[in-house]
């Protein structure tokens, strides 16, 4: 993983909603974009964070301080 990972605001939006358990379809409805676009942003975030899936991307983003940790 690069020392400084920079995610776009939309990638962070998609990761945020994914962290809350939303599907791509649900996130798309919330953000007013297509579900495929959500998948595109999540795939880019995964690549930038050096992980294989959205769960790992959320965990890495929290670890890097890009997303706040969720509490129950």
Residue ranges of each PLM-predicted region?
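Residue-level detector of secondary-structure transition/capping positions
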Residues: 22, 35, 46, 65-66
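Residues within the DNA-recognition helix of helix-turn-helix
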Residues: 41-44
């Amino acid at each position: 993983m690069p020392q400084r990972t920079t995610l776009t605001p939309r990638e962070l939006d998609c990761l945020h909603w994914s962290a809350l358990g939303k599907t791509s379809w649900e996130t798309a409805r919330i953000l007013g974009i297509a579900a495929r676009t959500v998948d595109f942003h999540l795939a880019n975030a995964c690549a930038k964070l050096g992980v294989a899936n959205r769960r790992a991307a959320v965990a890495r983003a929290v670890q890097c301080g890009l997303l706040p940790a969720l509490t129950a």
